[in-house]
Amino acid sequence: MNKKLILCAAFLVAAVANTFACTNLIVGKNASADGSTIVSYSADSYGLFGELYHYPAATYKKGTLLDVYEWDTGKYLGKIEQARQTYNVIGNMNEFQVTIGETTFGGRPELADSTGIIDYGSLIYIGLQRSRTAREAIKIMTDLVQQLSLIHISE
């Protein structure tokens, strides 16, 4: 009995331990009462207060550069080539219903690349602005990481 009580107490402590990950709630059409698909995202950080971002669709001239700022801090990271066409994004979903959430966490410091000019937040929103499908978003984001190096250690 004591072993079960101790194990249960340890589990409860672990369950409520302080973490710095974000939260996603995803409900598929077969799990909702009316067949709706529901996606919710929260940046569970004390410094991020859940703004609803909007990036309007646009067409750009060839050679246009995009300033990249770190999503968490607003720190300028560098410039990348802008796509010729971008799509409307509100929150974490674009006009084609491509939706991206994240649940990041602390990572190993030796994996950080101080020369990187893209962070996870920029990847999310650039991926959404440039993609019509989830597969396309994944390709765009992985190509950007390969070309520019990811500045964060955990994502």
Task: Give the residues covered by each predicted segment.
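N-terminal secretory signal peptides that target proteins for export/translocation
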Residues: 1-2
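Sec-dependent N-terminal signal peptides
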Residues: 5-15
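Sec/Tat signal peptide C-region and signal peptidase I cleavage site
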Residues: 16-21
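A contiguous strand-loop segment
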Residues: 22-119, 140-154
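Second-shell loop/turn segments in exported
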Residues: 113, 122-131
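Short, charged, surface-exposed loops that flank catalytic or proteolytic processing sites
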Residues: 130-138
